[in-house]
């Protein structure tokens, strides 16, 4: 993972799934996506090194390679994660992602490949904006 500045207040942690970091004018830091399982700890190392504390996580969608680090970072920093109402269903029922990718209810092995932490505190982007 490598941190790169891509704008005056915007950074990217380059990885298999890029992680966005954006600072608001009032100094809040938004973390955009958190990679796969185990990436939360790696992201935290970068944040700690820079002295940054996230205000929240915004997930572009709830595929496992975008929310895998959520649980660790949410617990460590006591922050919420936001997603769209549409993706809230996928967050509630992780087998939906496997069914969506498979074109029907998936076999057992596919259900476990796409398994993720489920509802670990997602909030609706639509309802809070």
Feature roles, as predicted:
Residues 46-129:
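Active-site HxH/HxHxD metal-binding segment of metal-dependent hydrolases
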């Amino acid at each position: 993972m490598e941190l790169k500045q891509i704008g005056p207040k915007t950074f990217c942690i380059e990885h298999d799934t890029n992680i966005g970091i954006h600072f608001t004018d009032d100094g809040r830091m938004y973390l955009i996506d958190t990679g796969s399982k185990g990436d939360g700890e790696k992201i935290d190392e970068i944040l700690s090194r820079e002295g940054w504390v996230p205000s929240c996580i915004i997930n572009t969608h709830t595929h496992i390679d975008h929310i895998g680090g959520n649980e660790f970072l949410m617990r460590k920093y006591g922050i919420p994660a936001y997603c769209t109402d549409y993706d809230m269903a996928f967050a509630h029922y992780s087998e939906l992602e496997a069914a969506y990718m498979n074109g029907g209810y998936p076999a057992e092995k596919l259900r476990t490949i796409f398994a993720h932490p489920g509802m670990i505190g997602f909030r609706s982007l639509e309802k809070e904006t």
